[in-house]
From Swiss-Prot:
Membrane topology value: Lipid-anchor
Record Pfam families: DUF3326 (PF11805)
Lipidation feature positions (S-diacylglycerol cysteine): 18
Tree of life domain: Bacteria
Keyword Membrane: yes
Source organism of the structure: Synechococcus sp. (strain ATCC 27144 / PCC 6301 / SAUG 1402/1)
Places the protein is found: Cell membrane
Disulfide-bond pairs as recorded: none
Protein name according to UniProt: Uncharacterized lipoprotein syc1174_c
Primary localisation category: membrane
InterPro entries per UniProt: DUF3326
First and last residue of the signal peptide: 1-17
GO cellular component: plasma membrane
Lipid attachment locations (N-palmitoyl cysteine): 18
């Protein structure tokens, strides 16, 4: 094939209540559409994870959020793999029955999907996850024992694991208003912000693929829940999608290494993100290098930070359908503006020539 292949990046930040991507796997249809018009799509677990539901896409790189920022900064490159040996990291706070449920998911993934889940470890202390919510509505969280988390991760890596699936015990509060709103398709995922903190710690320390699945007791049956949150009502764990994603997640390598067929930071051609969430470090790095940023207005969030507030140049698009069309035109070698009505006149850099022409 002649010409450059199209590498797209899709970012939907977690914990800010995005209209698309703020729930359990509800950004997967968007990822599938973008992947279909791209040669390669790079995205993160919040986009691809749907609890018990997932959709393997051969041209999608599953990259943890902190790693994505380091990649955008030019510090890391991505090394595609055939498969990863996955290690299971379980919080000591998980009750025995709930731990067995997660163990069964890992064993089922080996038996039915052929994944390589090679070792498991229980932390030497309860991790102590605490959930928080900012005044804006965005969620975040902390863990009391990051040292225990990192020691357990180190054990798995020394045992030959190449990617880590973390299962931390999250607080149960089925009566919480925030949780009830989320189940009804309103508000913000109360778990999302804390999940990101856990995976960031491991990736920052060890530079390996990592994703998180919270351990919770099953919620009471509610026939009125929103379809957008329904994926989290299935089964006993959120682990299946994490194992599927990590199984072929690219490994993280220093950008200074010489690696054949790696995905280099300069490979990125275009970035798609919610219009109110383009202030993250990754997007700012890409924008500074002149990479087109497609800011989608319909993907609202709890944030109210516009591109103009940050001085970030973007392509303002109303819908994700418009973004998919923009990508298709761009891949075909067209100026996407050529598909809209109106005159596009040539602009002279020499001001006097411009005046003479217009006069």
């Amino acid at each position: 094939m002649l010409g450059r292949s199209l590498t797209s990046v899709l970012i939907v930040p977690t914990g800010i209540g995005c209209a698309v991507g703020g729930y359990a796997g509800d950004a997967l249809p968007l990822a599938r559409a973008i992947a279909s018009v791209s040669d390669r799509l790079i995205t993160h677990p919040n986009v691809m994870n749907g609890a018990s539901l997932y959709w393997p896409l051969p041209n999608v790189a599953y990259v943890e959020g902190y790693a994505l920022d380091r990649f955008a900064a030019g510090d890391w490159q991505l090394q595609p793999v055939h498969c990863n040996r996955i290690g299971l990291l379980l919080d000591a706070a998980i009750e025995p029955e709930l731990r067995i449920r997660h163990q069964q998911v890992a064993e089922a993934a080996q038996a039915t999907l052929g994944l390589s889940v090679t070792a498991a470890v229980i932390t030497d202390a309860p991790l102590g996850v605490t959930l928080r919510q900012a005044d804006s509505g965005s969620t975040w969280g902390t863990i009391d024992r990051p040292d225990s988390l990192l020691r357990a991760a180190d054990q798995l890596l020394k045992a030959g694991c190449e990617a880590i699936a973390v299962i931390a015990r999250f607080p149960d509060d089925p009566g919480a208003i925030a949780l009830q709103d989320y189940r009804q398709g309103q508000g913000v995922d109360p778990l999302a912000g804390a999940e990101a903190v856990i995976s960031h710690l491991i990736v920052r320390e060890f530079q390996v693929p990592c994703a998180h699945a919270p351990a919770l007791q099953p919620l009471p049956l509610d026939a009125s829940i929103s379809p957008r949150s329904a994926a989290e009502e299935l089964g006993h764990t959120f682990l299946p999608c994490v194992l599927a994603g990590l199984s072929r997640a690219p490994r993280y390598r220093s950008a200074t290494e010489s690696i054949a067929e790696s995905i280099r930071p300069e490979s990125v051609d275009v970035v798609i993100a919610p219009e109110t969430a383009i202030g993250g470090p990754g997007i700012l790095h890409w924008a500074a290098r002149g990479i087109p940023i497609l800011a989608v207005a319909e993907n609202r969030s709890t944030l109210d930070l516009r591109p103009v507030d940050l001085g970030v140049p973007v392509q303002h698009l109303q819908t994700h359908l418009e973004a998919v069309g923009w990508l298709a035109a761009y891949k075909a070698g067209l100026d996407p503006a050529a598909l809209s009505p109106g005159d596009r006149r040539l602009s002279y850099l020499n001001h006097s020539v411009q005046q003479a022409t217009s006069g």
